[in-house]
């Protein structure tokens, strides 16, 4: 038995270095499926430590496909797993904030447990998702937004894919995904399904020199800034961590209902997003998109506050800029035509 796994089995905790090596063993295929399943099950049962998480993140970043990190980008990504079947809020918000001037490197995947993953809905919107790293950089430079399809950058995850599917419950990989952006984005909005895990992820990311990151969790269980209740926020700005609660009504946004933002398929999600960007819908769908887009504009340094960012996002939708941005993102480059 792998000695690091043995330590877990015997109730021990791993140092950052030990966790790093255990993750490398998983990613390299050195562990058997039974050993991977045992490791993930033990961690899920007792909970991961921040030190272990930092070691895991470093290993996953080291195993990811290399990509130049010169661009000043913002990512919005979530752990998923909230089970609330909402439309792809962070994807809609990404389009809005890219229309407002922020450079977005959207990291995502197809759906695993939700009704619609970010890759699924972008395809339904007619946006190419499987671009090369070079093409993605050009998209970000020229259109302010590019999509980083996770399987293209984290191919070593195939070593644990079958085990994760068989286990059928949340594992540490749900938490690691948002922390392992291929461009190692220093500015992020990370949605988390619980306050406890948000705090854990913030503590794990802090030693890795983030510039400005918001970890957000709705009191309704949504892994976004929500419109139906208050939201819990951990703001990590360089080495300063601040915790606070946001009430959407403080932003002049009327609280809505989950039923107003729930969908049953990627196609339904895409249709709602189009209506939002075309300013053909009001209420909760528009407000939750603007709230999350505004948060990223704040993190990107395009707005002085969350309030100012939210107002800017609403104006970006109302003046037609978001609609125009969607049309730009749909336009294929010559390279995309070749690989389509």
Curated annotation (Swiss-Prot):
The keyword Cell cycle does not apply. Binds 2 magnesium ions per monomer. Pfam families: Glycos_trans_3N, Glycos_transf_3. Anthranilate 1 binds at residues 78, 109. Keywords: Amino-acid biosynthesis, Aromatic amino acid biosynthesis, Glycosyltransferase, Magnesium, Metal-binding, Transferase, Tryptophan biosynthesis. GO terms for molecular function: anthranilate phosphoribosyltransferase activity; magnesium ion binding. Mg(2+) 2 binds at residues 223-224. It catalyses: N-(5-phospho-beta-D-ribosyl)anthranilate + diphosphate = 5-phospho-alpha-D-ribose 1-diphosphate + anthranilate. Pathway: Amino-acid biosynthesis; L-tryptophan biosynthesis; L-tryptophan from chorismate: step 2/5. Its EC number is 2.4.2.18. 5-phospho-alpha-D-ribose 1-diphosphate binds at residues 78, 81-82, 86, 88-91, 106-114, 118. InterPro entries: Anthranilate_Pribosyl_Tfrase, Glycosyl_Trfase_fam3, Glycosyl_Trfase_fam3_N_dom, Glycosyl_Trfase_fam3_N_dom_sf, Nuc_phospho_transferase. GO terms for biological process: L-tryptophan biosynthetic process. Anthranilate 2 binds at residue 164. GO terms for cellular component: cytosol. The keyword Zinc does not apply. Its cofactor is Mg(2+). Mg(2+) 1 binds at residues 90, 224. Catalyzes the transfer of the phosphoribosyl group of 5-phosphorylribose-1-pyrophosphate (PRPP) to anthranilate to yield N-(5'-phosphoribosyl)-anthranilate (PRA). Homodimer. HAMAP family: TrpD. Belongs to the anthranilate phosphoribosyltransferase family. This is Anthranilate phosphoribosyltransferase. The gene is trpD.
């Amino acid at each position: 038995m792998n000695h690091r796994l043995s330590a877990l089995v015997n109730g021990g905790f791993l140092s950052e270095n030990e966790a790093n090596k255990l993750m490398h063993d998983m990613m390299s295929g050195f562990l058997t499926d039974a050993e991977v399943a045992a490791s993930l099950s033990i961690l899920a049962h007792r909970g991961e430590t921040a030190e272990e998480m930092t070691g895991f993140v470093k290993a996953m970043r080291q195993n990811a496909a290399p990509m130049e990190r010169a661009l000043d980008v913002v990512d919005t990504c979530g752990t998923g797993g909230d089970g609330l079947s909402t439309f792809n809020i962070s994807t809609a918000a990404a389009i809005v904030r890219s229309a407002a001037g922020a450079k977005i490197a959207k990291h995502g995947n197809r759906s695993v447990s939700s009704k619609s993953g970010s890759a699924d809905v972008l395809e339904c919107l007619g946006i190419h998702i499987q671009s090369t790293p070079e093409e993605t950089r050009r998209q970000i430079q020229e259109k302010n937004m590019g999509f980083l399809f996770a399987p293209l950058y984290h191919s070593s995850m195939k070593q644990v894919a079958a085990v994760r599917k068989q286990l059928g419950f949340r594992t540490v990989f749900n938490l690691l995904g948002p922390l392992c952006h291929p461009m190692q984005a220093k500015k992020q909005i990370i949605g988390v399904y619980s306050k406890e895990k948000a705090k854990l992820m913030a503590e794990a990311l802090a030693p890795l020199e983030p510039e400005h990151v918001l970890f957000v969790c709705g009191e309704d269980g949504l892994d976004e800034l929500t419109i139906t209740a208050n939201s819990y926020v951990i703001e990590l700005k360089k080495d300063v961590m601040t915790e606070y609660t946001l009430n959407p009504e403080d932003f002049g946004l009327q609280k809505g209902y989950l039923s107003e933002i729930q969908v049953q398929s990627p196609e339904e999600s895409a249709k709602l997003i189009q209506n939002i960007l075309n300013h053909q819908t009001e209420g909760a769908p528009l407000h939750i998109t603007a709230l999350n887009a505004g948060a990223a504009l704040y993190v990107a340094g395009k707005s002085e506050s969350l309030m100012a960012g939210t107002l800017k996002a609403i104006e970006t939708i109302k003046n037609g800029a978001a609609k125009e941005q969607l049309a730009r993102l749909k336009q294929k480059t010559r390279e995309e035509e070749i690989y389509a």
